[in-house]
């Protein structure tokens, strides 16, 4: 707003000073004083634009005194021109302000809708510390085709991370559908493999031939064991306490929603207090710098050992793609076995 005031008043001041400097016989700049409210209407609110118009109109009238032509028809036309164009500028400012307000309200509604689609994960469930982050590849969007969710009861904790093939509104819609499928399946199926099969069956009618979702499912029943099922998803990364960072290699089934899967394989993974398991989508593994080089996931070992691990991971990704781009949405879920 300060820039708008500065530009408008500077324009008016230059025109007034020029009008004063010109010989009275050629002083015809008063009609141009309307430029000030025209500048104001593009950035200032309605009341401020009206104030600038008032100053421009007062300056145009004053111009008639110092040029001694206030009663001349030409000066009257100039003053009326400033009044008419200034009034139009005020009307333009009002239309602009209303439109900006409407856009802001729509943006708030869209933000609330996007946040409703992507669940807020609990910080602690089933003896596991949980944190999550999401980065959309679409500027201005909060969510896209990547997703995560957590289903927790007294007896079992189940987590999902997935990546829908697709972007934009279509990807968001399908991501919401996948989350719904997960919640239904997680609530009624007894094994993690059956959860994946149930989700696959549910999604088939909603996905066309080119649509699918990769997913990694994690289940915690016993304190020192995790069960994993992969449906075409990148492998989780395990950071062992006092050891290195390594992917968890498990059988990788077909993505969900294809209807081509006969069954899924569960794999049990032991973990100990202090261990951390990173679930991620391919926005992490496929992050490229300006030369097209992929991010080396080994660089994540140091930040994953820190207290605010996911913030550190995102910093590594941002530094890597600087000058390049985050070509896909990125979802991260970190599971930690609390230290005894």
Regions found by a protein language model. Give the residues of each.
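DG-centered beta-turn motif at the end of beta-strands
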Residues: 45, 163, 233, 280-283, ...
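Subset of alpha-helical transmembrane segments and adjacent helix-loop junctions
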Residues: 3-8, 15-33, 51-52, 71-77
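Active-site-proximal, acidic helix/loop segment immediately C-terminal to a metal-coordinating Asp/Glu
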Residues: 168-185, 251-252, 265, 271-325, ...
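Regulatory cytosolic signal-relay segments
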Residues: 82-145
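Hydrophobic, membrane-inserted alpha-helices
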Residues: 10-16, 33-38, 56-61
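Transmembrane alpha-helices and immediately adjacent membrane-cytoplasm interface residues
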Residues: 40, 44, 48-51, 55-103
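Catalytic core of PPM/PP2C metal-dependent serine/threonine phosphatase domains
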Residues: 170-249, 264, 335
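PP2C/PPM family metal-dependent serine/threonine protein phosphatase catalytic domain
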Residues: 128-141, 200-203, 234-268, 293-294, ...
């Amino acid at each position: 707003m300060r820039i708008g005031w500065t530009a408008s008043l500077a324009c008016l001041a230059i025109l007034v000073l020029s009008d004063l400097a010109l010989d009275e016989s050629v002083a015809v700049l008063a009609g141009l004083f309307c430029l000030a409210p025209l500048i104001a209407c593009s950035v200032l609110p309605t009341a401020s634009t009206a104030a600038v118009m008032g100053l421009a109109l007062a300056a145009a009238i004053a111009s008639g005194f110092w040029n001694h032509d206030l009663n001349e028809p030409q000066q009257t036309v100039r003053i009326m021109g400033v009044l008419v164009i200034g009034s139009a500028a005020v009307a333009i400012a009002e239309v602009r302000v209303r439109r900006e307000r409407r856009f802001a309200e729509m943006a708030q509604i869209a933000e609330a809708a996007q946040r409703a689609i992507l669940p807020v994960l609990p910080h602690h469930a089933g003896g596991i510390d949980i944190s999550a982050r999401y980065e959309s590849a679409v500027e201005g969007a909060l969510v896209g085709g990547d997703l995560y969710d957590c289903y927790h009861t007294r007896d079992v904790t189940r987590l999902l991370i997935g990546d829908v093939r697709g972007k934009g509104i279509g990807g968001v819609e399908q991501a919401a559908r996948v989350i719904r499928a997960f919640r239904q399946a997680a609530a009624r199926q007894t094994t993690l493999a059956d959860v994946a099969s149930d989700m696959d069956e549910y999604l088939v009618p909603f996905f066309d031939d080119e649509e699918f979702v990769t997913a990694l499912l994690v289940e915690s029943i016993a304190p020192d064991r995790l069960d994993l099922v992969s449906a075409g998803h990148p492998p989780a990364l395990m950071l062992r306490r006092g050891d290195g960072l390594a992917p968890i290699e498990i059988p990788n089934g077909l993505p969900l929603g294809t209807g081509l899967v006969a069954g899924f394989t569960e794999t049990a993974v032991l973990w100990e207090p202090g261990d951390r398991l990173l679930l991620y989508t391919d926005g992490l593994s496929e992050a490229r710098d300006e030369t097209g080089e992929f991010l080396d996931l080994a660089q994540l070992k140091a930040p994953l050992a820190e207290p605010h691990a996911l913030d550190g991971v995102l910093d590594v990704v941002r530094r890597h793609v600087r000058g390049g781009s985050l070509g896909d949405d990125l979802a991260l879920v970190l599971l930690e076995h609390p230290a005894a």
